[in-house]
Amino acid sequence: MENHRGFLGSIHRLPFVPKRNLRKDGNHLLEHLYVSLWRDMEKRRYPKRKPLVSNLLHDREAVMLYSPTGVGKTWLSLSIALIAAGRGSLDLLDWRNDEAQPVCYVDGEMLEEDIQERIRLLIPSLGVDENLLRKNFSFVSRVSQPDSNEDFLSLDMEQHQWDLLKWIRDNTRKNSHPIVILDNLSNLVEL
């Protein structure tokens, strides 16, 4: 048992040194990571996570949909957004939301009028409260920006990351958990 404790103690003291991702000033991006040992972690009590869309999405979660083009990722993510923002449901998958949440849907490839058409088609089948949807659903489209706006959201730019975090902060209120949907990631990062 003594060897076991010594082994854990030595792990706790090991520094984390990434092999890449150096900042411009030469320091590692991840040099100050918080590390939890099981002996500490097992004692912690975490707050119960709130379902935002039952059986699918909870607060403090990240979800990524991945599949080839043309299989319906936008339809699916838009349905999730509408259920969350408009207190809707999809009985087939047992998805529902009893408390409307603010949603920012950022689209990198579709025209706003195409999304409008999809939303109009989805509203009746999802039982969305349209008044809540009007209040809680924000949509940002890359291709619907005016020509004068050359600087669309690009997640590899630090200022744009801060802008997105500001939206989250501005839309966080008691019992609300802002949801950001990025559709699709490859169009929102300059490669």
Ranges and model annotations:
Residues 1-29:
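Short, small/acidic-rich helices and loops at N termini and domain boundaries
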Residues 6-9, 13-14, 35-36, 46, ...:
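Intrinsically disordered, low-complexity segments used for protein-protein interactions
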Residues 22-124, 129, 139, 169:
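The Walker A/P-loop phosphate-binding site
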Residues 10, 16, 24, 35, ...:
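Generic detector of low-complexity/intrinsically disordered segments
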Residues 69, 98-191:
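Conserved inter-motif catalytic segment of the P-loop NTP-binding fold
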